[in-house]
């Protein structure tokens, strides 16, 4: 939890450095719903980081894992002209057009969690997260060290390219 809060605070700090106004509006568009056990920690980190830094933030996510809906949420965020947008990037091909529209509008974009392999190709300013393939390799090594001989990687979000890469590791 502390690590997630630190990552979110770092993301927000970086976004703030690129704008001059005191009242900063940051929109977070995630593929993970705030009621999911993992993503609730991330949302709480966003909320705490924004409160601590005295900025306004909005966390949005599709009701289910849905790249078309997520692209619409990014487009909607762009139309609100925030000072910065933080996104997850589970599928660069599906979200690329929307991300590039944000950047073309002069809005700083940072990715978190997923997207380490693709964020630079889209022009995203920075990424906070692990490289997916290497994370999968590390997970496999830990399982082997614990005595595991076989593994099954289940991708619970069909279409999440980042998880496909992790399973490949």
Regions found by a protein language model. Give the residues of each.
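A residue-level marker of the well-folded mature domains of exported/periplasmic proteins
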Residues: 2-5, 16, 21-169
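Sec-dependent N-terminal signal peptides
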Residues: 6-12
């Amino acid at each position: 939890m502390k690590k997630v809060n630190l990552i979110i605070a770092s993301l927000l700090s970086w976004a703030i450095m690129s704008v001059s106004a005191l009242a900063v509006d940051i929109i977070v568009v995630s593929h993970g719903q705030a009621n999911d056990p993992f993503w609730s920690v991330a949302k709480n980190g966003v909320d705490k980081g924004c409160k601590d830094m005295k900025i306004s933030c909005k966390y949005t996510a599709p009701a289910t894992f849905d790249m078309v809906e997520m692209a619409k949420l990014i487009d909607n965020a762009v139309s609100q002209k925030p000072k910065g947008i933080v996104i997850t990037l589970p599928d660069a091909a599906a979200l690329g057009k929307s991300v590039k529209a944000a950047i073309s509008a002069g809005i700083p974009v940072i990715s978190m969690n997923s997207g380490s392999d693709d964020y630079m190709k889209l022009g995203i300013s920075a990424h906070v997260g692990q490289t997916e393939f290497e994370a999968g390799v590390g997970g496999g090594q830990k399982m082997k060290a614990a005595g595991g001989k076989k593994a099954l990687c289940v991708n619970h979000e069909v279409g999440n390219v980042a998880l496909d890469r992790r399973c490949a590791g």
